[in-house]
């Protein structure tokens, strides 16, 4: 189930999705252009695959992943340290009534996809997929 869906199965509103995409583009642009002067952030390429907005659009959960999946904790700490600056930059680039507060989280989807791939390659699953029956 995508992160934007509530446990009841309702999908996120189109406005939340649109604003989340605008914030995602703004954060990704700031990070890619070297707008934050931090040694950790300057030495890492950071992808921003998703931003999830709260219903009132005042809180943005920004999912990030350093390229290569290494040094997640230092990158997250550096982003947290500069979150006020990033919030101000997002406010300048995205026209909203309130600048959303940014919360940074590591995107776990890549690790989860790799774990599932590894499970699918196990002999027991390969046997099930090929249609062989146990006797």
Swiss-Prot record:
Query: Which NCBIfam families does the entry mention?
Result: PRK00521.2-5 (NF001802), rbfA (TIGR00082)
Biological role: One of several proteins that assist in the late maturation steps of the functional core of the 30S ribosomal subunit. Associates with free 30S ribosomal subunits (but not with 30S subunits that are part of 70S ribosomes or polysomes). Required for efficient processing of 16S rRNA. May interact with the 5'-terminal helix region of 16S rRNA.
What Gene Ontology cellular component terms go with this record?
cytosol
Q: Name one Pfam family in it.
A: RBFA
Q: Can the keyword Coiled coil be found in this entry's annotation?
A: no
Q: Which UniProt keywords apply?
A: Cytoplasm, Ribosome biogenesis
Single Gene Ontology BP annotation: maturation of SSU-rRNA
Subunit and partners: Monomer. Binds 30S ribosomal subunits, but not 50S ribosomal subunits or 70S ribosomes.
What this protein is called in its record is Ribosome-binding factor A
Which PANTHER family does this one have?
A: RIBOSOME-BINDING FACTOR A, CHLOROPLASTIC-RELATED
Q: Name one GO molecular function term.
A: ribosomal small subunit binding
Q: Which HAMAP family match?
A: RbfA
- Predominant cellular place of this UniProt entry's protein: cytoplasm
- Give compartment(s): Cytoplasm
Provide the family line: Belongs to the RbfA family.
Q: Which gene encodes it?
A: rbfA
Q: Which InterPro entries match?
A: KH_dom-like_a/b, RbfA, RbfA_dom_sf, Ribosome-bd_factorA_CS
This protein's species is: Rhodopseudomonas palustris (strain HaA2)
């Amino acid at each position: 189930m995508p992160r934007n869906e509530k446990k009841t199965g309702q999908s996120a509103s189109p406005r939340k999705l649109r604003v989340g995409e605008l914030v995602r583009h703004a954060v990704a642009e700031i990070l890619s252009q070297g707008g934050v002067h931090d040694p950790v952030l300057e030495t890492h390429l950071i992808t921003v695959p998703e931003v999830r907005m709260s219903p009132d659009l005042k809180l943005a959960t920004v999912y990030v992943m350093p390229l290569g999946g290494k040094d997640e904790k230092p990158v997250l700490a550096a982003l947290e340290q500069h979150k006020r600056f990033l919030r101000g930059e997002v406010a300048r680039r995205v026209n909203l009534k309130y600048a959303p507060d940014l919360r940074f989280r590591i995107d776990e989807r890549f690790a989860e996809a790799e774990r599932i791939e590894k499970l699918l390659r196990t002999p027991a699953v390969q046997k099930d997929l090929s249609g062989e029956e146990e006797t």
